[in-house]
């Protein structure tokens, strides 16, 4: 089921039995364009519903599928073909993708819908990127932080990093930005008070 989590922001999930978490995807309808982020697999009904939502916002055409990291490739190839849009990923993750990517970005770039790309160093993959929507005070993360417990954030298991301590320190970069909402690729997102939750985790 696809739901409107926030005005102009739709989400859907696929439950991972292995991880015991929801894998989350996003559709963002901007002022004059739309994007999909980290799409997990969709059932047939969800696929039709996603198409209906996109078609109903024809004045904001879908421009791209954006990936926060190489491991969130997921259903991007399917949606690339279905909607004839390019897949974008951080330049540092391009070579590791299973399928060929169309476009790359780097930290500091401004992408579709006004999204700011924030490079996060020393994470699970070299191209881990946060997507920031300044006007809406929304931060979007892939594997940098996950939501295992509602209202809280945590990192992936230590064996996913070359240096877990350094990876955690580098996440302090997120606190340089003002955000109320944190949308995570894995687990439960935080719609209010998200920056405080991130700060609490990083300072413990």
Q: What positions do the PLM features span?
A:
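Short, flexible loop segments at the rims of nucleotide/cofactor-binding pockets, characterized by
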Residues: 11-17, 39-44, 64-67, 115-121, ...
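Structural motif corresponding to alpha-helix initiation and N-cap regions
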Residues: 47, 73, 114, 125-126, ...
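Active-site HxH/HxHxD metal-binding segment of metal-dependent hydrolases
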Residues: 41-111
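Zn-dependent metallo-beta-lactamase
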Residues: 1-33, 52, 175, 196-199
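Short hydrophobic-aromatic micro-motifs
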Residues: 9-12, 34-38, 87-89, 115-118, ...
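Metallo-beta-lactamase
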Residues: 33-43, 60, 122-203
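Internal catalytic-core helix/loop-beta-alpha segment
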Residues: 102-133
């Amino acid at each position: 089921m696809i739901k409107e989590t926030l005005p102009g922001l739709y989400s859907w999930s696929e439950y991972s039995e292995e991880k015991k978490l929801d894998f989350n995807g996003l559709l963002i309808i901007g002022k004059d364009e739309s994007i999909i982020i980290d799409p997990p697999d969709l059932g047939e009904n969800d696929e039709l519903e996603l198409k209906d939502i996109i078609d109903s916002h024809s004045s904001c055409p879908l421009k791209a599928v954006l990936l926060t990291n190489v491991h969130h490739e997921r259903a991007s190839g399917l949606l690339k073909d279905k909607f004839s849009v390019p897949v974008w990923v951080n330049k540092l993750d391009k070579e590791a993708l299973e399928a060929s990517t169309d476009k790359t970005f780097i930290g500091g770039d401004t992408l579709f819908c006004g999204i700011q790309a924030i490079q996060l160093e020393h994470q699970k993959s070299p191209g881990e990127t946060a997507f920031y929507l300044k006007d809406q005070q929304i931060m979007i993360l892939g594997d940098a932080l996950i939501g295992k417990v509602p209202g809280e954030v945590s990192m992936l298991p230590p064996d996913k990093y070359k240096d877990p301590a350094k990876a955690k320190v580098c996440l302090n970069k997120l606190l340089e930005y003002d955000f109320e909402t944190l949308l995570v690729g894995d687990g439960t997102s935080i719609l209010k008070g998200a920056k405080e939750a991130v700060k609490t985790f990083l300072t413990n």
